[in-house]
Amino acid sequence: MNAIFIDAKNKTVSMIEVENDLQSMYDKIGCLLVQTVPFAGENIVCDEEGRLKRWTAGFELGDWRIVGNALIVGDTEDGDFADTKLSANAIM
């Protein structure tokens, strides 16, 4: 699945391919639980426990303050994750 990866520590935003399953997302973000929040008609998938950890990196998107790494993915009418329609440049 096409996704945007936000690497909070290295302060980079890039287009990536990630398997459309939770374990792949956990591995890429570096977490055990994810939370999804709406953003620009897409979904920010981030570490649900990010604020409880000692992360020293984060970012803001719109009204959201995210601690740690995140993915931006799209969704289907059924609510499943899908390719993002945004570009990495749209996030920067």
Specify the residue positions occupied by each region the protein language model found.
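Short beta-rich binding modules
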Residues: 1-92
